[in-house]
Amino acid sequence: MPLLESTLHIRHLGRQDYESVWHAMQHYTDNRDENSQDEIWVVEHTPVFTQGQAGKSEHILNPGDIPVIQVDRGGQVTYHGPGQLVIYPLLDIKRLKVGVRQLVTHIEQSIVNMLKRYDVEAYAKADAPGVYVEERKVASLGLRIRKGCSFHGLALNVDMDMSPFQRINPCGYAGMEMIQCKQLGGPQTVEEAGKQLVETLSQELGLANLVHHQGLPESL
């Protein structure tokens, strides 16, 4: 495998508002060509509800002072906020020879594998994307594929204020109970979770050569 195809660039973005990162990953994806590098963006967002393309307004119960943004990913409404790890895999899945369903499985399995390091038994569900522990949801997924390339990604609850989830039906499921790593004895900080999950995700994708960066690409 050529070096370009086997190298994964990891960008650590820190805490950012949702909209600017969303527009940056749209721009990155729209301007990709066959030589563009694959990247994973690791970020923590300020509080926001995002409504996916399948989203129905009745699932947003009482947003209050938290903004609601309609976005171009799959899925329904979810919440992002401090203490939650968000990872955006910006991958040329055509070049990697990975199908969309296969990519979802790789992402879910990487979370399961990461939590297994902490003796937490997690699992995916065929009918409801995400990762669960004892029927409570610890991670949400929502992807978009454009020109054979992925953007958007996953959100893992680590150590956060969970109360905003009560203002919505998470992922369109009324009464869906959410849980976080801190309660489970998993990683206790976003930084720790990010380090572990980048490892298991790159292993799942078969990409061993990792190059770390701080901040967005200079071209954005």
Curated annotation (Swiss-Prot):
Residues 34-209 form the BPL/LPL catalytic domain. Keywords: Acyltransferase, Cytoplasm, Transferase. It comes from the Bacteria. It is an enzyme of class 2 (transferase). The record marks K137 as: Lowers pKa of active site Cys. The keyword RNA-binding does not apply. PROSITE patterns: BPL_LPL_CATALYTIC, LIPB. Its EC number is 2.3.1.181. GO terms for cellular component: cytoplasm. GO terms for biological process: protein modification process. The active site is at C171. It is found in: Cytoplasm. It catalyses: octanoyl-[ACP] + L-lysyl-[protein] = N(6)-octanoyl-L-lysyl-[protein] + holo-[ACP] + H(+). GO terms for molecular function: lipoyl(octanoyl) transferase activity. Pfam families: LplA-B_cat (PF21948). Substrate binds at R73, G74, G75, Q76, V77, T78, Y79, H80, S140, L141, G142, G153, L154, A155. The keyword Cell membrane does not apply. Pathway: Protein modification; protein lipoylation via endogenous pathway; protein N(6)-(lipoyl)lysine from octanoyl-[acyl-carrier-protein]: step 1/2. Catalyzes the transfer of endogenously produced octanoic acid from octanoyl-acyl-carrier-protein onto the lipoyl domains of lipoate-dependent enzymes. Lipoyl-ACP can also act as a substrate although octanoyl-ACP is likely to be the physiological substrate. Belongs to the LipB family. In the reaction, the free carboxyl group of octanoic acid is attached via an amide linkage to the epsilon-amino group of a specific lysine residue of lipoyl domains of lipoate-dependent enzymes. HAMAP family: LipB. This is Octanoyltransferase. It comes from Shewanella piezotolerans (strain WP3 / JCM 13877). The lineage of its organism: Bacteria, Pseudomonadati, Pseudomonadota, Gammaproteobacteria, Alteromonadales.
